[in-house]
Amino acid sequence: NYECYKGLYSSFNSANFYEILYSLNRQFGKDPWCLYTGKHLFNFVDNHDVERVASILEDKNQLPLIYTMLFTMPGIPCIYYGSEWGIEGKKNWNDTDLRPEIKVFEWNELTDTIQKLIHLKHNHSALSYGDYTQIGITNTACIYQRQDEKECLWICMNMKNEAQTLGFNGQGNFIDIETNEEVPVHNALEFKPYEVRILKKVS
């Protein structure tokens, strides 16, 4: 899925969530003209042919956010070897730096984040089989929904290094699936800097 590969890193570098969510709507939305609704495309943020995402992202604090989007958008997420540790690699006169021989790196915060995302993907069917709906968006904050017959999840993120509030048309009672905190939503959601939340609707 090269369209979303480009949309992912470009959206963060240009502070423009509209780019990637346009692609997600175009590919996986509910309208009859959407391209791949119900299909499972192979998604990635880097591979052996392109520069490592840790080298492309201008703000490394956004790495957990881009991986959250990779694992929660429709499709099959792929982690290129070494990127779970956040290693860098840029193209020079050849591609050697993109696929180096590496020793085992020490576990770090990004590795921990990716492991949690793998666990979420395996244990929440909506992330694998649910439909996709955009809930709210600004240039730097977004919420989208994954829903199947078992559950309804909202993926909520703020790419900015400052708090902000995202207003949208939607409400309900939710639980943060990481903290089990109850989160009542009434047409707005407040974000901390660089915050990602996955909320499960309970009523």
Give the predicted meaning of each segment.
Residues 74, 79, 83-203:
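Carbohydrate-interacting/catalytic domains
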Residues 1-92, 138-139, 146-148, 155, ...:
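Conserved alpha/beta catalytic core and glycan-binding cleft of carbohydrate-active enzymes
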